[in-house]
Design a protein with these regions (language model features):
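SAM-dependent methyltransferase catalytic region
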Residues: 1-182
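Class I S-adenosyl-L-methionine
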Residues: 181-214
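E2/UBC-UEV (E2-variant) core
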Residues: 110-124, 239-272
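A short acidic, often aromatic-flanked loop/helix-cap motif at beta-alpha or helix-coil junctions
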Residues: 51-55, 188-192, 238-242, 269-271
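Flexible, glycine-/basic-rich loop-and-beta segments that form/coincide
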Residues: 202-251
Length: 294
């Protein structure tokens, strides 16, 4: 545990307050688990923009003033990372430049989204693919070793699971990974009436209106070339936030017997849930069928 704590656990934060909170939390968990009598500081946290590290011409943050931080960033970039865990922000539609997740420019990462998720999408409007949480999935998918495999585990905006504009994203997940686990926590409050009540409590409280998913993307090099097996679990209807969180806590693991995974086979439109059957065809000719009243 001490070896992993000191050498194998890395953390990035760009907001100073969040940086210190994350540092304290990691140190607290380590000391609670190990029951050490002497304090051992955590040295794996970096004050940096994770997405900026993917850019070919990235700038080392505050190199002159924070040399230790710069060394940590260099060490992390040289490290083989096989498991990435996070809660990425989402930023499309932010109301002002003062919002927490500002829409910064990441040319290389945007290019990667364009040549993967956007290329494989049949949607004509791809704005939603440039949301920060989508970029996080793209960055993490590229960051894990392509030949050795790894795991990406995110709790994120869940709009991608059935969004028409994210069909290319779902196609890429199937092509790039071998196993996919999606726990749909629902909570979509961009709805109204009975549908809103069915969606249940908002996972992140009053500040959240989007649906939330916990997603595990597994890349197993032994199964290279095979389409991913998609495991899906819907948390259920009419549940409060507290009920949902208790259920997640009780699950403990994706191998839990309490989790009844449904195996999904996507259709040719890359629908995973709420699949279209393709039987209905609507044309403008329907407007010609009129009933005349004399």
């Amino acid at each position: 545990m001490e070896r992993k704590y000191q050498n194998e656990i890395h953390c990035n934060e760009i907001v100073l307050l969040a940086y210190y909170i994350a540092d304290v939390n990691i140190e607290s968990v380590f000391h609670d688990i190990t029951h050490r009598k002497t304090y051992l500081p955590y040295s794996g946290i970096c004050l940096t923009d994770t997405f900026q590290l993917a850019e070919k011409k990235h700038n080392e943050l505050f190199t002159e003033f924070f040399q230790d931080n710069s060394k940590r960033v260099k060490k992390q970039m040289a490290t083989h990372v096989r498991v990435i865990v996070g809660n990425p922000p989402y930023s499309i539609g932010q109301k002002s430049a003062n919002d927490n997740a500002q829409n910064l420019s990441y040319p290389y990462l945007d290019k990667r989204v364009s040549e993967t998720y956007a290329v494989k999408s049949s949607a004509t409007l791809n704005k939603s693919l440039y949301d920060s949480y989508v970029k996080a999935f793209r960055w993490a998918s590229d960051r894990i070793p392509q030949n050795e495999g790894g795991i990406v585990a995110f709790i994120s905006n869940g709009a991608w699971i059935d969004g028409a504009g994210q069909d290319g994203m779902r196609r890429c997940f199937e092509d790039e990974f071998t196993s996919i686990y999606v726990l749909n926590l629902r909570g979509n409050q961009r709805t109204s009436g009975e549908l809103s009540r069915k969606e249940g409590g908002k996972i992140f409280g009053s500040g959240s209106r989007t649906p939330i998913t916990i997603t595990f993307l597994v890349k197993n090099p032994a199964k290279k070339g095979q389409k991913a097996v998609i495991h899906y679990h819907d948390i259920g209807d009419y549940l409060t936030r507290e009920q949902k969180l208790k259920m997640v806590k009780d699950f403990r693991s994706i191998s839990s017997q309490k989790l009844e995974w449904q195996i999904i086979t996507s259709n040719d439109k890359a629908d995973w849930i709420n699949q279209r059957d393709g039987c209905l065809l609507y044309t403008s000719d329907a407007a010609d069928d009129r009933i005349s009243v004399d």
